[in-house]
Amino acid sequence: MVDTKTPGDKKLSVPSKTLSLKPRVETGTVRQSFSHGRSKQVVVEKRGKRRIGDGPEPHAPEVTAKPAPAAPAPSRPAPPPAPPRNAGSGVVLRTLTEDERSARASALADAKLREVEERRQAEEEAQRRAVREAAERAEREAAEARRKAEDERHRHEDEAKRKAETEAKKRFGEGEQPASAARPATAAPAAPAPRPGAPAARPGTTTTRPGTTTARPATTTAQRPGAPAGRGPAVAAEPDEDEAPRQIRRGPGGAARPAPPPKTTHKPGPQKERGRLTVVTALNADEVRERSIASFRRRTQRLKGHASNEPKEKLIREVIIPEAITIQELANRMAERAVDVIRMLMKQGAMHKITDVIDADTAQLIAEELGHTVKRVAASDVEEGLFDQVDDSTDTETRSPVVTVMGHVDHGKTSLLDALRHANVVSGEAGGITQHIGAYQVVSPESGKKITFIDTPGHAAFTAMRARGAKVTDIVVLVVAADDGVMPQTVEAINHAKAARVPIIVAINKIDKPDAKPERVRTELLQHEVQVESFGGDVVDVEVSAKNKTNLDKLLEMIALQADILDLKTNSERPAEGTVIEAKLDRGRGPVATVLVQRGTLRVGDIIVAGAEMGRVRALISDQGETVQEAGPSVPVEVLGFNGPPEAGDRLAVVENEARARQVTSYRAHQKRENAAASISGMRGSLEQMMSQLKTAGRKEFPLIIKADVQGSLEAILGSLEKLGTDEVAARILHAGVGGISESDVTLAEGFNAAIIGFSVRANKEAAAAAKRNGIEIRYYNIIYDLVDDVKKAMSGLLAPTLRETMLGNAAILEIFNISKVGKVAGCRVTDGTVERGANVRLIRDNVVVHEGKLSTLKRFKDEVKEVQSGQECGMAFENYHDMRAGDVIECYRVETIQRSL
């Protein structure tokens, strides 16, 4: 090329000093250890950074003398100096063109722009680094302050422990020993050694690299023998690795960040250990040694050790213990280890696992022994507060009495109530007998007060109904017919009233009949400890006639007087409580329960619980069939809204919300299942029960499905059928429920070949069609005694008939004849009675029965005859038996089959 500025010939020349490459690699060997005791020599090379320049080679590692300012913007390295040109000779270069000049100008402008941008980025990076370093410095100072406080606390603890040991030795006569002998003296704090990044380097020991301001202090410590030459020197007094702060380097050639010198005592380690060459130190030779993970782990363990030596405060907890709890759950509630609980049980002689269930008493002993307080709870706690809450006497008011009418069958209980209510309930009852329990309200014409009457059945099958009526009543009116006297159900009603501890008013009915004898009734009542007032007792008696409505007002007056004596009061503003008198499943209205409210007021919308059923009151219907919004104390109502029909006799209560209702019903359902399972498992317990099961294993069963209109009638039917069972045959109730006969009942009956019985209910159209299609028998009844009689007859048909033997006569064998085509024929003489052809016979030899069978041939003078009278001779042959001898006796008898009945 031609240079326009220096025209002339130019020649290329070589610089005076020849360029050369010096080896920049330092080598060394280390021994690398492997598992199982193996080791290997490894050659390690340290490659230094190549630096080009005329300055002398540095002999010490570079150390920054002070914190480096912001790094200048990087620029392109300067070209090497041009060699001296020899004027007057060489190749002539051509002049630059305009395109080349413009290209060079644009490249120069771009370079300047890049330089400005790089300088700006460097300044921003320096600012960010300064902010980060300030935050790290503040964090480091805070950590240093915490470490100083921790060291001071440890020093005080060690001093206190040392004093305690000295005092203990003095007390036990071992003599006082100086603290220096008991504990090694702590090395005096040494002056901090110069560290990389210190503000000033040791004078006279630095070597300055050209173009830099970084100094490398020369070390005064000899290198380890065998170390490679040129390796960075080791620090003379390096702090302990547990206490050495971490040094952060920003990169090769960058200045190290200054760190404050440590002010704590340093433990000088062996020079040999610090100068050892390893793979890590060889690869990171230009970095300062950092704190290792093992050092951090040792420090953490040391702090944990100090913390474990401190006495821990025992936490006392309130432990809730149910009726049964596992060991693991008990330990969790006490915040104790399960092994500690098992260890305590082992001391008591019980071996358990953490999954074993222990009772509440054992759990309470363990919790109290560990210092905790115990709160015992039970599953039945969900029923607390439902019933029998004490009312304040200032909030009570007088309520109507509840009167139960009881007595024997056909003594006129329902007729008496009809006369009081001016109604005709008897005509509506099937067969003219009461089979349901009913509740009614009557207004007394004298005082205008209401009286609640409960009518109970008088038949023997309705014992449970009478017992329920006696439990919820205040007064019992015992109806006795004047012409019939005291009967078995009358005695039962007296016992129910005594068990319920309620007063009795005797109503002697049917005094209008000519053969009525009221005095005989009073005398018979004395035999059962019922003493009327006319006989000097305290029991009120009234002679009435339901037919002619005689003395009914006097009976009401006596009831009101007895109620005043009882002083019946209750709080009507509290949540309602009552008793389910009767329950049924209505097809249109769903589950319906007849409830007698005893305390409080039952309102529409209340959430109620009765037995294992719950619900919300949708409607209240009075005894007159009217819909009401609320029912107060002593008021009988029909309640609609249950999820299912409750059982008769269940107590009803109003709860605050559905969650509480679900808790109560789930607990009661669980108890019901447990009781059923216990009754089944209890039947397999003892040896006697097993023998009885073996005895009844051959018992025949009569499968039945029973559907009734109300719960009380169903209960009476089941009780009556249960009494029909014997050791040979029994009624097996596959399903019993309240409501109409459904298609599912027919399906169940088909699977077990059972009969379906409907009491005051009918089958729907689908069920009737399915029963007709599958040949299932459905029987309908309205009177309980007709139902029981038919089932009794059907069960009697399953009984094995009785076989009765009737003796006909005896015959003695005189001689044996062999007849062709017939075999042996015995020539006999009838000694007693008669002998008939086809009758059963026994062959007796020496008073021992040797054969039982039937006569095949009976002849007299070669003629077949039907019978032979006593004193006559005949010939007899047996079926399939010919071993007859002279002198044997033939006994002839007839077997009669007699059908048995329950």
From Swiss-Prot:
One GO MF term: GTPase activity
HAMAP family: IF_2_B (MF_00100_B)
Presence of keyword Transferase: no
Region (G5): 545-547
CDD domains: IF2_eIF5B (cd01887), IF2_mtIF2_II (cd03702), mtIF2_IVc (cd03692)
InterPro entries, A to Z: EF-G-like_DII (IPR053905), EFTu-like_2 (IPR004161), IF2_assoc_dom_bac (IPR013575), IF2_II (IPR044145), IF2_N (IPR006847), P-loop_NTPase (IPR027417), Small_GTP-bd (IPR005225), T_Tr_GTP-bd_dom (IPR000795)
Residue ranges, compositional bias (Low complexity): 181-190, 198-237
G4: annotated segments: 509-512
Location within or outside the cell: Cytoplasm
Keyword Oxidoreductase part of the UniProt annotation: no
Region (Disordered): 1-276
GO BP terms: translational initiation
Composition-biased stretches (Pro residues): 69-84
Basic and acidic residues composition bias: residue spans: 1-12, 43-60, 111-174
Region: G3, residue numbers: 455-458
Lineage: Bacteria, Pseudomonadati, Pseudomonadota, Alphaproteobacteria, Hyphomicrobiales
UniProt: GTP binding residues: 407-414, 455-459, 509-512
tr-type G domain location: 398-567
PANTHER family: TR-TYPE G DOMAIN-CONTAINING PROTEIN, TRANSLATION INITIATION FACTOR IF-2-RELATED
Function recorded in the entry: One of the essential components for the initiation of protein synthesis. Protects formylmethionyl-tRNA from spontaneous hydrolysis and promotes its binding to the 30S ribosomal subunits. Also involved in the hydrolysis of GTP during the formation of the 70S ribosomal complex.
One GO cellular component, as annotated: cytoplasm
Keywords: Cytoplasm, GTP-binding, Initiation factor, Nucleotide-binding, Protein biosynthesis
Entry protein name: Translation initiation factor IF-2
Region (G1): 407-414
Family the entry assigns: Belongs to the TRAFAC class translation factor GTPase superfamily. Classic translation factor GTPase family. IF-2 subfamily.
